[in-house]
Amino acid sequence: MKGIYSALMVPYNEDGSINEKGLREIIRYNIDKMKVDGLYVGGSTGENFMISTEEKKRVFEIAIDEAKDSVNLIAQVGSINLNEAVELGKYVTKLGYKCLSAVTPFYYKFDFSEIKDYYETIVRETGNYMIIYSIPFLTGVNMSLSQFGELFENEKIIGVKFTAGDFYLLERVRKAFPDKLIFAGFDEMLLPATVLGVDGAIGSTYNINGIRAKQIFELAKNSKIDEALKIQHTTNDLIEGILSNGLYQTIKEILKLEGVDAGYCRKPMKKISQKQIEFAKELHKKFLKN
């Protein structure tokens, strides 16, 4: 399960419905053009927390139908509604997903015993493997080394998507749990995360920049740090431009420039403006056009 995973982007029609044809095109682009090792389905990049349970199920259905066995798939089923998380976990397990992920429960200030019960309930009810999704800058949930250790005592909890800038904690987790999977979650810090020993990475920009991400990862693993750093610099120039212009809107616009029907973002996200479109064209021409 190691390697570079795109956090799968989901295209929506102007009325907010899922653009199913476009979703299949994005999946194919990731597999055929970006050459990613896997897809992380149902995460933030898919605007997952703004869609219904039935819509989430449809995304999971399309992803596994289109990808089949060509890449690894991880299904993010997390929700502050534990019943929904379990329902989705059971559903995707029946579909054939071999591993789940779940964001730490957020909004309410859950204590660690509640967070632990949340993960153990999903694992127990589904019988599937679990990757913790730790993204404290959005959830407000910061877990300690000892808390990761408590969760990892469950043999079904096999790793973490580590989307945090605390690289001291990342190093400690890596040293303490050499047999657990660690995926870096910040695309702009892939190189230092790889040096610290992550097993792979999951990111939104890999939908359009997956080839560079794979280069950084492989070069760093082979101690070719100077070469990897040059590519990370270029990657971060691209990411800086994307973030300044609207993350999801810009990635979707760049996908359109690549001939992919990437649709629109789901409200309340804004529709992309003409000014944003023009800047996306500049980024595409400078960083991605062959």
From Swiss-Prot:
User: What are the UniProt keywords, alphabetically?
Assistant: Carbohydrate metabolism, Cytoplasm, Lyase, Schiff base
- Organism domain of life: Bacteria
Q: Where is the active site?
A: 133, 161
EC no. given is 4.1.3.3
Q: Where in the cell is it found?
A: Cytoplasm
Cited InterPro entries: Aldolase_TIM, DapA-like, NanA, Schiff_base-form_aldolases_AS, Schiff_base-form_aldolases_CS
GO terms for CC?
A: cytosol
Under which main EC class is this enzyme filed?
Answer: lyase
Q: Which reaction does it catalyse?
A: aceneuramate = aldehydo-N-acetyl-D-mannosamine + pyruvate
A Pfam family it matches: DHDPS
* Residue numbers binding aceneuramate: 44-45, 163, 185, 187-188, 204
The annotated pathway is: Amino-sugar metabolism; N-acetylneuraminate degradation; D-fructose 6-phosphate from N-acetylneuraminate: step 1/5
**PROSITE patterns (alphabetical):** DHDPS_1, DHDPS_2
Family, according to the entry, reads as follows: Belongs to the DapA family. NanA subfamily.
Q: How does it assemble?
A: Homotetramer.
The cross-references to PANTHER family, in alphabetical order and at most eight, read: N-ACETYLNEURAMINATE LYASE (PTHR42849:SF1)
Q: Its function?
A: Catalyzes the reversible aldol cleavage of N-acetylneuraminic acid (sialic acid; Neu5Ac) to form pyruvate and N-acetylmannosamine (ManNAc) via a Schiff base intermediate.
Q: Which NCBIfam families match?
A: nanA, PRK04147.1
The name this protein carries in UniProt is N-acetylneuraminate lyase
Q: Lineage of this protein's species?
A: Bacteria, Fusobacteriati, Fusobacteriota, Fusobacteriia, Fusobacteriales
Query: Quick one: which gene encodes this?
Result: nanA
